[in-house]
């Protein structure tokens, strides 16, 4: 029988009594041999979300996400469902960029509402970063962007630059 013995999760009020007024939570780094993903990753385009939904891409967000993905076309490739990978890091607490790089070897990466700091990447919201040879964007969640016309335009501008689309 599985029993969660972590005091801070079961009895958070007891933590203060045991530890005093200062409490430091340490985010332990974990290595995963496999991470569940959607897509074929042919063009090494990693998409990262962080939500408690059962599906990696919730049904309500699927249509908008695939419209964006299939709009990515340049002289090197035309993006499709086989061209990207999508993961939900909420199920992989403690995962770091080195682990993701090892498993997916991304050349392009978008954090959709998932804080890149969780995996050790420093990037501002609606900004970009370069990690090794991977171009990284950090934007709002798919749901937030799909409901806001200005954010859609802003996203498309960043995606065009990332993939060098004319």
Region locations from a protein language model:
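A polyanion-binding, active-site-adjacent surface
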Residues: 1-166
């Amino acid at each position: 029988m599985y029993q969660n013995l972590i005091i801070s999760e079961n009895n958070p009020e007891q933590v203060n009594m045991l530890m005093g007024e200062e409490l430091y939570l340490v985010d332990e780094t974990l290595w995963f041999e496999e991470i569940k993903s959607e897509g074929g990753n042919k063009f090494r385009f990693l998409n990262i979300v962080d939500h408690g939904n059962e599906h990696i891409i919730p049904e309500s967000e699927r249509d908008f996400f695939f419209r964006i993905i299939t709009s990515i076309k340049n002289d090197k490739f035309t993006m499709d469902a086989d061209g990207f990978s999508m993961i939900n890091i909420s199920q992989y607490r403690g995962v770091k960029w080195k682990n993701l790089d090892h498993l997916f070897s991304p050349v392009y990466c978008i954090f959709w509402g998932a804080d890149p700091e969780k995996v050790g990447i420093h990037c501002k919201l609606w900004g970009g970063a370069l990690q090794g040879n991977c171009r990284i964007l950090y934007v709002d969640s798919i749901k937030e962007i799909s409901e806001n016309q200005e954010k859609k335009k802003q996203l498309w501008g960043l995606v065009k630059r990332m993939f060098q689309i004319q």
